[in-house]
Amino acid sequence: MENCSFHVPSLEEICSVLKSGLLKNFADVSVIVTECPDLSKEPFEFPVKGLCGKSRIADVGGVPYLVPKPRLDKVYNVNAVAKKIGLPGAYILGAGATSHKSLGMNAELIFSVQAENESIQAVNKSYVASVNPGDGSCLLEKYRDRNNDNDFGLLSNLYACEGKPGKVIEVSVKRRIGQDNFVSCMRKSLKTHYGEKAVGLGGTFLLKEGKAKLHVMPREYSACPLNTDEDVNGWLKFYEMKAPLICQSVFVSHDPGYDLRLEHTHCFSHHGEGGHYHYDTTPDTVEYLGYFHPAELLYRIDKPSATHMVGRD
């Protein structure tokens, strides 16, 4: 495991940087510092109330453990990760893959879990998005309805904190006028301003209005090696999904040499849809509302020794 400190500007400064970038991509933009809403309430229903306290980002495993061929031996545990990053009992959100050993299939994992510590058991409110074997539609399930463990597999991008209330960055945008998706626009805004000073943000956002393109990995791993982005896209199942979507997002402005996935967002809903977010498909009507917090520390866990850039979108 490797770790380093992020550059952590003030919340007010980050607001200003994000706003300047978002205005090039959305017609209506508001970015302010505010008290984190109670995220234990609808529609989020997290096991904690906030996104604050000892914030950090963990990049675990990586795409090279999925493509060209899956490494099914790569199994990780949320409680172990929380301890490894010095935060037992952490609230963890983000995007990753399920463990084949836990579920007997491949699927998208949408993290929302409070890890265990000496005094509490883990509270896992994560979701699993898989391809319905009956009709090929998306099947969204609560992780706890499938398994009682807290494992995941292959790769994940996680934001961890104490789950406390506190000040966060609220981002509200409507009507997309540029080409970048919501997350890419924010990440690129930070990169343009801070350059090689890595800034990491994690949080949750709502697709309040409109629709978005998402993918879900098939239950069966590819029989043929996935050597190119075209191979990967041919294997994935793509869907257009409707609002409201609750999206768990982790993004980093600059990779300081750790072979990071710079952005990764997975979504769940209360109407049975979820998966890996790509971009909205309804620019004229789209509306996003998000709450984010900068991470203080970066942890790189089980970095693949042989890497590539396939399948990073």
From Swiss-Prot:
Annotated keywords: Cytoplasm, Hydrolase, Metal-binding, Nucleus, Zinc
GO biological process: DNA damage response; regulation of DNA repair
Gene Ontology CC, one term: cytoplasm
Cofactor(s) this protein cannot do without: Zn(2+)
SMART domains membership: DUF1907
Name of the protein this chain belongs to: Ester hydrolase C11orf54 homolog
Coiled coil: none
Molecular function per GO: hydrolase activity, acting on ester bonds; zinc ion binding
Domain of life: Eukaryota
InterPro entries (UniProt xref): C11orf54_DUF1907 (IPR015021)
Subunit structure: Monomer.
Leading EC class: hydrolase
UniProt binding sites for Zn(2+): H264, H266, H276
Predominant location category: nucleus
Compartments, record wording: Nucleus; Cytoplasm
